[in-house]
Amino acid sequence: MIVRNLEEARQTDRLVTAENGNWDSTRLSLAEDGGNCSFHITRIFEGTETHIHYKHHFEAVYCIEGEGEVETLADGKIWPIKPGDIYILDQHDEHLLRASKTMHLACVFTPGLTGNEVHREDGSYAPADEADDQKPL
């Protein structure tokens, strides 16, 4: 069994911060822990907009705290996000995530992340079996 504490994990390399300062993510469970998914607590900071397009990963996102919206770029549809809401990127949806109040999100990825991924310029992460040599955001 593996037991981790969020605040303790934030003091380690499990805390990944976007180069542009829009978000940080504490990777509590990673691919190396076994299983086929990873689990993260991510903060999207107030007043930011982040372009995301997980071409190689399925993601489910549950809002714990804060407020914002997610916009799918294919159709321009906007969904408000508040505590208690979940959005599921079941079609690898390219989207914009905006926070009107800092959002605390519980995120599950499959396949699981290794922990060192950063968003590429196109908003994606590298496939699980590919080295990530593209420039990060």
Curated annotation (Swiss-Prot):
Pathway: Amine and polyamine biosynthesis; ectoine biosynthesis; L-ectoine from L-aspartate 4-semialdehyde: step 3/3. Optimum temperature is 0-10 degrees Celsius in the presence of 0.05 M NaCl, 15 degrees Celsius in the presence of 0.77 M NaCl, and 30 degrees Celsius in the presence of 3.0 M NaCl. CDD domains: cupin_EctC (cd06978). Its EC number is 4.2.1.108. InterPro entries: Ectoine_synth, RmlC-like_jellyroll, RmlC_Cupin_sf. Seems to require potassium ions for its activity and stability. Slightly inhibited by N-ethylmaleimide. Disulfide bonds: none annotated. It is an enzyme of class 4 (lyase). One of its GO terms (molecular function) is ectoine synthase activity. Residues 118-137 are annotated as: Disordered. The keyword Lyase applies. Optimum pH is 8.5-9.0. Keywords: Lyase. One of its GO terms (biological process) is ectoine biosynthetic process. It catalyses: (2S)-4-acetamido-2-aminobutanoate = L-ectoine + H2O. It holds the Pfam family Ectoine_synth. Coiled coil: none annotated. Catalyzes the circularization of gamma-N-acetyl-alpha,gamma-diaminobutyric acid (ADABA) to ectoine (1,4,5,6-tetrahydro-2-methyl-4-pyrimidine carboxylic acid), which is an excellent osmoprotectant. Does not act on N-acetylated amino acids like N-alpha-acetyl-L-asparagine,N-alpha-acetyl-L-ornithine, N-alpha-acetyl-L-lysine and N-epsilon-acetyl-L-lysine. Belongs to the ectoine synthase family. This is L-ectoine synthase.
